[in-house]
C-alpha cells in the first residue's frame, strides 16, 4: 500500500507534467490570436521619433509601411488623444515610431500564430497618480486603458475571433522620479499595478515585460540617483514575480539632441531597438528567441604558441551603436570585414552583459541589431601584421559613463561595471592559458565616454576617473606596466561645456604615465550627429587604434 507522501509526490509529478503539456499545447496553437498590450509614457509613445528616419537604419527598413497581418487598436496622447476607429492594420500613428512596429515584425517572424497589439500610452504620466489603479488622478490612465482594452476585446468577441491576452509590455517611470513619494514607493506601486491588471482582465497568469529606463539619456546622468531608485523598484518586482520580466534598454540608441547632443527620448533608432528587446523577452518565454551560433571551425592556435590578447572597452562607439553591417557592404574595400575570421578568437560581453559570446567565437559581426564595433577593422589590421596569434576580448556598455567603470563606482550601485570588467579580462586570460597558450595582455584599448563630454560635472571629472580606472586595473591584474590605449574623439563643442578643456586634462594624465597612450581621434570621417559615429567612423576608429599599437612595436 502506498504511503500518503508517495501518493502526494505522484500527484504533484502528474500535475507538473500536465502543466508542461498544457503550456506546450497552448504555444502549439497557431490559430488563436495572441493579443499584446503596450502601455506607458513618452518612451512607449515613441516621442521624438520620425517615420522618415527609419531609412537611416538599414536593419529596420520597411517598418514605416503598414503590417497588414497585424491588428492594431490604439489610444495615444494626453490632452489631445489619437484613437483608432476600431481595429486597423498596424502602422505608425501620426508619423511616430513606436516599439510595437519592430516588436510585431520580430514576433511574426518567429511564430505562425496571428497577433494583435492594443496600445494605450501618454507622455508625462506617472504610476503613482495617472496609472494608479485604486485612486487615479490627472489623466486617469488606468481606468482609461482598462476601458479601451475591454472595448477592443469586445469587438473581437463580436466577430467571434478566438484570442488570448499574451502579455503586457510596460515602459514607464521617468515622471515618478520627480515625486519623492512616488519614487520611493515605485516597487510597491508596480506590484499593485500588475495585480490589478490580472484581476481586472481576469488573467491571473498574465505576463508583464517591464522596460528598463535607459541610462544613456541625460536623465541617466543628471538624475542618476533617482533613475536608480526607479530601477531598484522595478527589479524588486521582477525578481519575485515569476510572470514579470525585466527588459534591459540602456544599450539601445538614443535620440541626438541639439546643443550638447544629449536627450531624454529614445528617438527613432531607440524605439525600433526597444521593440526588438520586448520581442526577444517574449520569445524567450516560449522558447523561440532567435539565436545565431558562431562557433570556431577549429581552435586557431597551436598548443604552446604565444597569443597576444587585445581588450577593447568603452561606451557608445566602442559598442558600435550606429555602425551597421549593411553600411559596411557599401564601403569600398571593406566587405571582407563581414566574413568571420577563424584565425582570430573573439570573446565579448556587450551592452553591460545583454549579449555575450558563447566562449570564443571567430572575429566577425556580432552586435545586437546588425551592428558592429571597431573590433572588425582593428582585428583585421593587427592580424595582418603580427606573427603571433591574435585574440580579441571586448567589454562594453553603451549606456554607461566613465564613473561606472571606476573602482568606487557611484550611488547607482547596480550600474557599477569595474568588478565585472576585471573579471572578464581575468577570465579571458585564464581561458587562453587553460587551452595551452602562452598569453600576453597586449593592452587595453578604451574609447573615452562620449556622453561624459556633454555634461559639465562628468566632463570635469573625466581625467581623474580615467586615471583611477587605469591605476587600479594594473593593481588588480598584477600588471604594473599594462599599456592603456585611450582614444578620444573630438569632445562636444558647445558653449555649455567648452570652458572645460578635457583634452588638455587627458594629455596631462598621459604625460605622467609612460604606459598610457592618448590617441586623438580627431580626423575621423565627418559625422552627421554629435556623440555617435556611423559605420565609416567606427571602421576608421578601429584602424586608428591598430595603427597606434603597431607604431609602438
Q: Where do the model's predicted regions map?
A:
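Bacterial N-terminal signal peptides that target proteins for export
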Residues: 1-11
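Bacterial N-terminal signal peptides
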Residues: 10-20
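Cell-envelope and extracellular/periplasmic
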Residues: 26-553
Amino acid at each position: 500500500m502506498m504511503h500518503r507522501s508517495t501518493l502526494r509526490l505522484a500527484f504533484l509529478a502528474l500535475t507538473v507534467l500536465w502543466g508542461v503539456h498544457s503550456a506546450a499545447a497552448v504555444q502549439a496553437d497557431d490559430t488563436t490570436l495572441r493579443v499584446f498590450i503596450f502601455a506607458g509614457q513618452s518612451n512607449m509613445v515613441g516621442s521624438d521619433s520620425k517615420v522618415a528616419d527609419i531609412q537611416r537604419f538599414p536593419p529596420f527598413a520597411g517598418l514605416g509601411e503598414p503590417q497588414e497581418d497585424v491588428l492594431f487598436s490604439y489610444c495615444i496622447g494626453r490632452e489631445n488623444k489619437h484613437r483608432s476607429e476600431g481595429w486597423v492594420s498596424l502602422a505608425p500613428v501620426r508619423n511616430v515610431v513606436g516599439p510595437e512596429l519592430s516588436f510585431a515584425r520580430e514576433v511574426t517572424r518567429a511564430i505562425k500564430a496571428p497577433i494583435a497589439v492594443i496600445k494605450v500610452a501618454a507622455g508625462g504620466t506617472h504610476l503613482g497618480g495617472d496609472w494608479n489603479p485604486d485612486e487615479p488622478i490627472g489623466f486617469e490612465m488606468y481606468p482609461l486603458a482598462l476601458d479601451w482594452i475591454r472595448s477592443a476585446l469586445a469587438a473581437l468577441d463580436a466577430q467571434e475571433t478566438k484570442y488570448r491576452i499574451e502579455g503586457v509590455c510596460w515602459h514607464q517611470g521617468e515622471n515618478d522620479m520627480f515625486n519623492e513619494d512616488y519614487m520611493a514607493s515605485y516597487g510597491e506601486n508596480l506590484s499593485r499595478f500588475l495585480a490589478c491588471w490580472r484581476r481586472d482582465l481576469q488573467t491571473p497568469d498574465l505576463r508583464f515585460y517591464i522596460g528598463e529606463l535607459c541610462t544613456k539619456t541625460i536623465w541617466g546622468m543628471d538624475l542618476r540617483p533617482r533613475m536608480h531608485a526607479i530601477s531598484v523598484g522595478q527589479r524588486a518586482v521582477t525578481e519575485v514575480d515569476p510572470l514579470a520580466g525585466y527588459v534591459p534598454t540602456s544599450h539601445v540608441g538614443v535620440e541626438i539632441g541639439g546643443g550638447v547632443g544629449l536627450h531624454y527620448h529614445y528617438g527613432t533608432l531607440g524605439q525600433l531597438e526597444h521593440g526588438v528587446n520586448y520581442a526577444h523577452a517574449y520569445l524567450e518565454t516560449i522558447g523561440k528567441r532567435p539565436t545565431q551560433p558562431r562557433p570556431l571551425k577549429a581552435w586557431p592556435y597551436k598548443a604552446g604558441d604565444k597569443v597576444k590578447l587585445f581588450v577593447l572597452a568603452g561606451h557608445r562607439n566602442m559598442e558600435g551603436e550606429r555602425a551597421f553591417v549593411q553600411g559596411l557592404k557599401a564601403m569600398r574595400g571593406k566587405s571582407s570585414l563581414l566574413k568571420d575570421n577563424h584565425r582570430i578568437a573573439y570573446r565579448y560581453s556587450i551592452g553591460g552583459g545583454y549579449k555575450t559570446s558563447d566562449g570564443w567565437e571567430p572575429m566577425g559581426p556580432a552586435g545586437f541589431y546588425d551592428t558592429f564595433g571597431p573590433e572588425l577593422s582593428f582585428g583585421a589590421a593587427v592580424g595582418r601584421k603580427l606573427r603571433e596569434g591574435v585574440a580579441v576580448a571586448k567589454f562594453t556598455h553603451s549606456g554607461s559613463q566613465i564613473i561606472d567603470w571606476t573602482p568606487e563606482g557611484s550611488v547607482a550601485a547596480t550600474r557599477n561595471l569595474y568588478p565585472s570588467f576585471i573579471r572578464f579580462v581575468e577570465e579571458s586570460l585564464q581561458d587562453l592559458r587553460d587551452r595551452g597558450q602562452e598569453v600576453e595582455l597586449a593592452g587595453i584599448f578604451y574609447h573615452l565616454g562620449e556622453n561624459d563630454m556633454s555634461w559639465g560635472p562628468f566632463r570635469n571629472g573625466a581625467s581623474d576617473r580615467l586615471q583611477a580606472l587605469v591605476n587600479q586595473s594594473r593593481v588588480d591584474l598584477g600588471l604594473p606596466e599594462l599599456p592603456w590605449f585611450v582614444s578620444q574623439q573630438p569632445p562636444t563643442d558647445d558653449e555649455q561645456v567648452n570652458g572645460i578643456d578635457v583634452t588638455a586634462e587627458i594629455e596631462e594624465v598621459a604625460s605622467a604615465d609612460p604606459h598610457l597612450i592618448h590617441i586623438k581621434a580627431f580626423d575621423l570621417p565627418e559625422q552627421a550627429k554629435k556623440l555617435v559615429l556611423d559605420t565609416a567612423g567606427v571602421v576608421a576608429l578601429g584602424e586608428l587604434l591598430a595603427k597606434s599599437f603597431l607604431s609602438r612595436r
